[in-house]
Amino acid sequence: MQDFLQAYSWINMRFLLTGLWVTIEVSVISIIFSFIIGSILGVIRYMKVKYLSAIVGFIIDMIRNLPLLLIIFFTYFALPRIGVHFNVTVSTIVAMTIFESAMLAEIVRSGIKAVPKGQLEGALSNGLNFYQALWHILLPQAYKKMIPPIVSQFVSLIKDTSLATIIMLPEVTFRAQTIYAQKPMEIIPMFLMLAILYFILNFTISQIGSYIDRRMVS
Amino acid sequence: MWTLFTSHASEFFTGFGWTILSSVIALIGSTILGLGFALLQIVPNRFANIVGKIYIEVVRNIPLLVITMFFYVVVAKVLNLNGFVSGTIGLTLYTSAFIAETIRAGINSVDSGQYEGARSNGLSWWQAMRYVVLPQAIRLVIPPLGNQFVNLIKNSSVLAFVAGLDLMYQANMISQLTFDTFGPYIIVAIFYLILTLPLSYYMRYLENKTDR
Amino acid sequence: MQIKKVAGLTLGFLAAGLFVSGVATSPVQAETAAKNQTYDRIKKTHTMNWGVKGDTKLMGLTNIRTGKLEGFDIDMAKAITKRIDPKAKPELTQITSGTRVPMLLNGNIDAIIATMTITPERKKVVDFSEPYFNAGQALMVMKKSDVKSIKDLNHKGARILGVQGSNSIENVKKFAPKAKVVALPDYATALTALESGQGDALTTDNSILYGMAVDNHNVKVVGGNFTTEPYGVAVDKADPKLTKAINKAIDEMKADGSYDKLAKKWFNDVPGMNWKEVTE
């Protein structure tokens, strides 16, 4: 029991929380970028622009069907070979953004598609052009319905930052491993703390998400 | 690229085999577990509902890597689990929470009048589920379930962290032997796509069909 | 009909993917970097990026209290940097055995000083400085284990833990061909795996193993060294000037006693280790 509590000394906790901050930082930046890029790609794919939509669709399908771990390796080890250099943090953000944008694009595309056809036709016959209809009629309704899948995608993103331990991103999982490798007695308390930290972070986000969802629907 | 593939073909195919095996075991295991936890959430018993809810929320909010590592380095002290087994258990538990949520959502979206009708015709709760609600729910959840299976195959790459012999592990080993950081990953990417792309497209086809 | 369409789409995409990747690889192999870019950049920007270990006690380890890296390799990196350019600041990037060579070749780091053995295979892809440390591969087992040497593990069913990208796992194939190698991403995971019974022994260089055994009383180093592992600083082949400068720095350090001082600082109090032996 004493060992157990000792594992939560201020020194260990500070080390872990610094890692949690890295997790949050990387996640938030990736969420912002992938939300913007994913939305644009999703709209392009929905619009069926000649060639462009097909190419975008092709890229999205490839990325969506590959493991994120593989994409992390790619951005960290393959991109520098064509002259693009990133440090670990930026690499992770780029990899997360590439992967999550593709995932979000698919959510956005099917979200817009789910808006009843009459809405678009109505808007067009009322004199709006396609982009106005998209911006004022289709997207607002689509996003309202998309809140749950988007939020769960963001939760996935936060969890997936743990995969970046493979390229030594000093986030919270990596730091927990560092601690229990040096102090084997602290392995169980470290796993418990990891579970608690991730749970609090992700559960809070899910709850906020469903709160917004309820507000929007009513 | 071709010579890299032919000179390490046995490693790549070994990895492919382990990835498939792990995915299939986890797919079966997580479907059974997921169905169980979905039912646990809707049975008319408050305690069971809470147990189901807690399991799903806890497992869903913790990274797969953390669950897998837990089995590999903590549980293995008591039970003898190697990397492949730990990884597959982690994958099964993690995916089961998502499948449970998917199935529960499917059951909820079946018109409640159906269930009430069945009950008022004298069917028990279980009979109403078994013969009226579940058959309809399953048809609804097949596309999202298929997407979960695609995620499962992709997530099986977590085995690489625990020497699970899968595709990703083999790619790492070959890459470190040959100092080539590009070729091995492109080759395993193709192997992954062989598994995931057909499933993805088939699910999209089913989705489009039900939409119409 | 639909199955055919799905199969067709998949095949089409795979073919296109192969084509794209083929195109993407070709210019990469043709690329030749300008000579001595790294050396000139260090002189200009006064920073030198080192790839170092963060999970091996004595050589390179993250201090949980301060969050900083410390060890013999780290001190060497700092000292060499100062001797190459007195104004330069060393930047330390944590790497693993598996990631260090690609990171060097990709230009993410300027040099590797991370328990890296000079081997003929590696010499084909990177340049090495002269050896600055003499390690040897050994075995670590749990205290209660009766494994005494690598020979005891040369049987079917034996599992030997190692780290991906280390040449120790290649050596196992020579010394215990019947044993199964379990290769993990880093030493932190490998040590934890040994304690959890994921293998019968952990093999790597004695310098790393002794470091692990300092704080951990459940494990022991056994059997003595069965290989010699001279460590060198690795540099991109395109930077011969940097390799030369590093060699000069190491020579100076050996001549003025600062090298011995560092070796003594880190290895003098380690049970089972003789600092004079490893620095010969």
Model regions: which residues?
Chain C
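Ligand-binding clefts/hinges and TM-proximal coupling segments of bilobed small-molecule sensing domains
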Residues: 31-36, 43, 167-181, 221-225, ...
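Short loop->beta-strand "edge-of-pocket" segments that line small-molecule binding or catalytic clefts
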Residues: 48-52, 70, 151-165
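Extracytoplasmic small-molecule ligand-binding "clamshell" domains
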Residues: 32-112
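A ligand-binding cleft/hinge motif common to bilobed small-molecule-binding domains
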Residues: 99, 116-124, 170-174, 193-228
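Extended ligand-binding regions for polar small-molecule ligands
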Residues: 74, 83, 151, 166, ...
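Acidic, polar ligand-binding/catalytic clefts
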Residues: 78, 89-152
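Periplasmic-binding protein-like
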Residues: 134-141, 206, 210-247, 269-280
